[in-house]
Amino acid sequence: MVIPLSEGDGTAAPSGLRSFVLPVRGGDCRLWGGHHLPASASEALPLLVCHGGPGVPSDYLFPLIGQLRRPIIFFDQLGCGRSDRPSPGEQEYSIAASVQDLVEVIQSLVLEGVIPRRDGLPAYHLYGQSFGGILAFEALSVHHGSSRPGPPPPRSLTLSNVPSSVPVLLEEVAALLAVLGGDGARFDATHVCRTLPRPPALVAAYAPGHPGSDWRGVDVIADWSATERSLGALALPVLLLAAEHDFVTLRSMEGWQRLAQQRLVVLPGVAHHALLETPEAYGASLESFLQDQEEEANCAVSST
């Protein structure tokens, strides 16, 4: 069920987003969601956005609105941002639990028509940035061959700045940090976000007054890697967005090269928050990929 929120509700988002609530985990917890509709009518399919962190709310991805010509659906993961924050624990804040939340989110959005149907099937694109990409990938692959119902498959998946192996990522981070003499501030300015002053959307996501997060950082994903089985199970177009100076290096993304239908785009001169550093180039790469998938699908339908 998708429950609308009034503008005066404390969980409401900035203007331009229609806020709503998504009950998960049997209705015991509520996730905040935000729905953007373009000013002019569009036949483009919606993009469902999974933010990263773990635990950085959706605010830093709101600039997607200005770069894409389509509906966009955001949500804050449990324990983060405007969503409910149950008591911290391994069961509440785990990849498996969050993957199931995402599955329920997608199912609710389809049921309520926020995700439309085309030719009788739910029609949307799925996008994950950083940790959000891990959740998106797991949601689509973990149910392969399982008796548990998974989400309806999207038309495409975008993995933006997402490692295929967190252990390899941690090795890369240690090496990059060593080159900088262990200077965390220089690492941040070189490999996290190279734009100064910091983009307002990123400042907002980390602001002291923000509802915040109960996630415990990278520790919850330290052992995660995409398995050969899950890589082989994913049979849909995938856009891999990388950045020249990102701490999520190409080496830490090598596993994604084994996906059957993948397109790699490396954005020059930017780091982990490439959307905020070079929004036009980022948006053009993403929108071009999404349009390509929709055009190919339309051609396939018209030829049958």
What does each model-found stretch correspond to?
Residues Q261-T304:
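Catalytic active-site module of serine/aspartate enzymes centered on a nucleophile-bearing elbow/loop
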Residues C80-F131, H143, G150:
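Active-site loop/oxyanion-hole signature of alpha/beta-hydrolase fold enzymes
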Residues D28-G89:
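Conserved HGGG/HGGXW glycine-rich cap/lid loop of the alpha/beta-hydrolase fold
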Residues L177-A178, D183-L236:
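Alpha/beta-hydrolase
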Residues F137, S141, P149-D183:
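Flexible "cap/lid" loop of the alpha/beta hydrolase fold
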Residues V49-G53, S130, A243:
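Glycine-rich His-Gly loop
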Residues I3-R30:
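N-terminal cap/lid segment of alpha/beta-hydrolase-fold proteins
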